[in-house]
Amino acid sequence: MTSQPTDVAIGIDGAAAPAPSGGAASGPIGTGSRGTRILGVVTLAAVALGAYLALVSSPQDETMGDVVRLLYVHVPVVTMAYVGCGITTIASAMYLWKKSTWWDVTAAAAAEVACVFTALTLAEGMIWARPTWGVWWVWDARLTSTAMLLLLLLGYLAVRRIPTDAGTRSRRSAVVGLLLLPNVFIVNRSVTWWRSLHQGTTILNTLQPKIHDQMAFALVFNIGVAALVFSWLLIHRWRLSWLEEQVESHDLDEALAERRAEAAADAATESARVGGSGA
């Protein structure tokens, strides 16, 4: 993705659109398009096939039995949560450098989707913990660091809702966005740095694989499915964020135009009054 001039941005589906700062909008006019509808159909088909592989085709685990089937959702969701945080951090850094609305909207859209996936990660982790550890929640390093990541994402979204001008809001949220990727690294390494009940990296270890080939295929396939779901949500959220920027910019332009008209009318009235008193 290349940098665009300040008055032009490229939509996430490839359509050119002027930035909200000026000009008539020629970007997305809705939250969906033909491309997103096709992507949605492909995603639904992939979800159905992924569910079959996870629930029917894949064998039980020798130790955990059917509980292992949570793995086919948990790992893909965690992966996409990390990807969303990474996109937010990169887009935030690019916004601080380029001051481009495109990057700001991209960071905001990715953060919202990442927040959903991170919340699902915690929920699935708790469901996993109940049959394997005997409790819904423990202050384990992995669970606690993931909860902190979710709080940071919620903080990012809260900063974007603080009433202020668009530039200040974008700068403040971008600074928070820079913290997401380092926190992802902390979450990922938490099982190594601290004592943890959570297992380490053993599932897809290429040197010593500890997973059945059919289970590995189902897992990798469902990671691809999660990527499709993530992409579909990100595109729709990006388009919605762009439209919100357009509405906000339009309202601001209208308010400024009304204020200028009022000022011009006041000036004309004052001029007429002065002219009348001089006569």
Language-model regions, residue ranges each:
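Polytopic transmembrane helical bundles with strong interfacial aromatic enrichment
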Residues: 2-279
